[in-house]
UniProtKB/Swiss-Prot annotation:
Promotes mitotic spindle assembly. One of its GO terms (molecular function) is ATP binding. Disulfide bonds: none annotated. Residues 1-116 are annotated as: Globular. Residues 88-101 have a biased composition (Polar residues). It comes from Xenopus laevis (African clawed frog). Belongs to the TRAFAC class myosin-kinesin ATPase superfamily. Kinesin family. NCD subfamily. Keywords: ATP-binding, Coiled coil, Cytoplasm, Cytoskeleton, Microtubule, Motor protein, Nucleotide-binding. It is found in: Cytoplasm, Cytoskeleton. ATP binds at G386, Q387, T388, G389, S390, G391, K392, T393. Residues 1-42, 81-101 are annotated as: Disordered. GO terms for cellular component: cytoplasm; microtubule. This is Carboxy-terminal kinesin 2. Gene3D superfamilies: 1.20.5.340, Kinesin motor domain (3.40.850.10).
Length: 643
């Protein structure tokens, strides 16, 4: 410092805020570290109080140069820059302990401690003291500047080391990630391998079990194979024997084949012969029926019922043993007194007469040949005639509780038809059957196969077409049947629906004519033959005189319609016998419906049923007279309906 004493004007020590600029966070931290360093240095300066203004003639001293701002790297470098008060010398240790720097700074004696405080007027002394202090600070500043340079170099080295370490750290991080990824893959593979090992272990165990099982099976098969091998040897021996037999059998087969061919030729000839014989049988059967008459009359006397056992019934006798005659006898009184005359006898002869003990089966045996004619293609009509209560319904249908022995003519005829049709299948015949069941009540047709008939339906008799005389009834139910049981069910339905009523003569009198018809269609494809016929089985309503029946109201109308239709039936049969040009079929619904079953192509059988009671003598006599008249008729030769 210049020795010339000059008066220096000391500036105010109040802090002046600097013009601050916007700095980044890193720069801000660096400035903060510099401020801390500066404050630590200033704390070591002695506190000197200087007057605010000094009157001196000396020039002002130059302002103290500002300390250079060292670049602070981190806390470790900052710790180096902060010297500790450890005596007169200050020892600084370089960063990370690699470089050690020692510097001894001569520190002046504490101002104001060892020296006495100068007087306020001793400005020169004060200036000298200040100069000494500045000189000391300059030396310290130089030391700090050198230390700062060394620290900067160390910082650069450390930065380079940090960069190298950061690069190595990045590489190591990447390697660590790679190794972790590989570790995860290896762990997954290990888990997969463990599962595979478990699966293979389980599979191995199963294979071992199967191997054990197969081993046992092989042993069993080997044993069986040994047995079969032995059997095979035995079979080969037998085969040699059988081969010889086979050769001889082949010769036998050839001979039998020739014989079978010859038998087939013979069978064809026999079949032709059988057909010829069957045709001849049909012809002879029809001839027998014609010889017996195409209109045949059977008389049947019903047995006495339990309530009638005490009533007189000895007026009927059967004089001959041939079963064709019946005699009615009656004692007559004189007109002038009670004197009795000789008994009057009425003799009648019919095709067959059945006394009361005759069973249903014996009666059917006489009509079975007529039923067979229906399968041969002839129209057949069988009806029962007689007064009410004479046993017509019993003869045709059977009793209420029917059994195999008490079945009437209708179920027995159906059974025979189906049985014969089954037997004829062996001869190449196939049959189809269509059944219907109706009643004619007060000249009105009713369908007995419908439980609740519609009153709006009208049943009219019409021709199928104008080319033939086939008839049908509109709205009537025609049922295809294939077995006896189906027909029996239809008979039960019809029996429940038939009109019956109580009269003075019979508690359960049939008040209508019931007509069961079965259409039979047969075909023999081998012979190219077809047949079509109709069998009609009729239970006529009971004939009775109005004076005996005491009918009134509806019963009177029923009796009148019944007697009218029966009279028309007698007229039709008489006209057929007389071969009249006009046959009054249309006079009643019954004769109009049965015209194809009563004409020249038909075979007709009439049952006349009479009561065994003497009180019914007049009605029995009238019935026998009507039957005798029918028995005298000849309606011509019946013809089968064949194509």
């Amino acid at each position: 410092m210049d020795s010339t004493d000059k008066k220096v004007q000391v500036a105010s020590r109040l802090p002046v805020p600097p013009k601050r600029k916007y700095v980044s966070n890193d720069e801000n931290q660096e400035q903060m570290q510099r401020k801390r360093l500066r404050s630590s240095l200033e704390s070591e300066l002695p506190a000197v109080r200087v007057a605010a203004s000094i009157a001196t003639s000396k020039p002002r001293a130059a302002p103290v140069a500002a300390l250079p701002k060292p670049q602070v790297i981190g806390r470790q470098s900052l710790a180096v820059m902060r010297p500790k008060n450890s005596g007169p010398g200050i020892t600084s240790t370089s960063f990370s302990g690699k470089t050690k720097v020692s510097s001894s700074v001569t520190q002046p004696a504490a101002i104001g401690a060892e020296k006495k405080k100068r007087a306020a007027w001793d400005l020169k002394g004060q200036v000298n003291d200040m100069r000494d202090t500045v000189s000391n600070y300059k030396g310290k500043m130089q030391n700090l500047t050198g230390e700062n340079a060394r620290l900067l170099n160390s910082k650069e080295k450390l930065q380079r080391e940090v960069e190298v370490l950061a690069s190595e750290n990045s590489k190591l991080s990447q390697e660590r990630c790679t190794l972790e990824s590989q570790l995860r893959e290896v762990r997954q593979q290990v888990s997969t391998f463990e599962r595979e090992v478990a699966r293979l272990t389980e599979l191995c165990q199963r294979q071992e079990k199967e191997l054990s099982s197969h081993t046992n099976t092989i042993e069993e098969l080997q044993g069986a194979n040994a047995i079969l091998t032995k059997q095979l040897l035995d079979k080969e021996v037998k085969l040699d024997c059988v081969s010889g037999e086979n050769t001889s059998l082949k010769h036998t087969v050839n001979e039998q084949t020739d014989e079978i061919a010859a038998l087939k030729v013979c069978l064809a000839e026999k079949d032709t012969e059988v057909h010829s014989l069957d045709t001849e049988r049909r012809r002879l059967h029809n001839l027998v029926q014609e010889l017996k008459g195409n209109i045949r009359v059977f008389c049947r006397v019903r047995p006495t019922l339990t309530p009638e056992r005490e009533l007189p019934a000895g007026h009927i006798s059967f004089p001959s043993n041939d079963g064709k005659a019946i005699v009615l006898s009656k004692m007559e009184e004189s007109h002038i007194g009670r004197e009795k005359k000789d008994a009057v006898k009425y003799d009648f002869n019919f095709d067959c007469v059945f006394p009361p003990p005759c069973s249903q089966e014996s009666v059917f045996e006489e009509i079975s040949l007529l039923v067979q004619s229906a399968l041969d293609g002839y129209p057949v009509c069988i009806f029962a005639y007689g007064q009410t209560g004479s046993g017509k319904t019993y003869t045709m249908e059977g009793p209420e509780d029917v059994t195999d022995d008490s079945m009437g003519m209708i179920p027995r005829a159906i059974h025979q038809i189906f049985s014969s049709a089954e037997e004829l299948k062996a001869k190449g015949w196939q049959y189809t059957f269509t059944a219907s069941f109706l009643e004619i009540y007060n000249e009105t047709i009713r369908d007995l196969l419908i439980n609740r008939p519609d009153k709006k339906l009208e049943y009219e008799i019409r021709k199928v077409n104008s080319a033939n005389m086939l008839l049908y009834v509109t709205n009537l139910r025609y049922v295809k049947v294939s077995c006896v049981e189906e027909v029996h069910e239809l008979l039960k339905i019809a029996k429940a629906n038939r009109s019956v009523a109580k009269t003075a003569i019979n508690d359960r009198s049939s008040r209508s004519h019931s007509v069961f018809q079965l259409k039979i269609e047969g075909e023999n494809k081998q012979r190219d033959l077809k047949t079509s016929s109709m069998i009609s089985l009729i239970d006529l309503a009971g004939s009775e005189r109005l004076d005996r029946s005491l009918s009134t109201g509806d019963r009177l109308k029923e009796t009148q319609c019944i007697n009218t239709s029966l009279s028309t039936l007698g007229m039709v049969i008489t006209s057929l016998c007389n071969k009249d040009s006009h046959i009054p079929y249309r006079n009643s619904k019954l004769t109009y419906l049965l015209q194809n079953s009563l004409g020249g192509n038909a075979k007709v059988l009439m049952f006349v049923n009479i009561s065994p009671l003497e009180e019914n003598f007049a009605e029995s006599l009238n019935s026998l007279r009507f039957a005798s008249k029918v028995n005298e008729c000849v309606i011509g030769t019946a013809r089968a309906n064949r194509k």
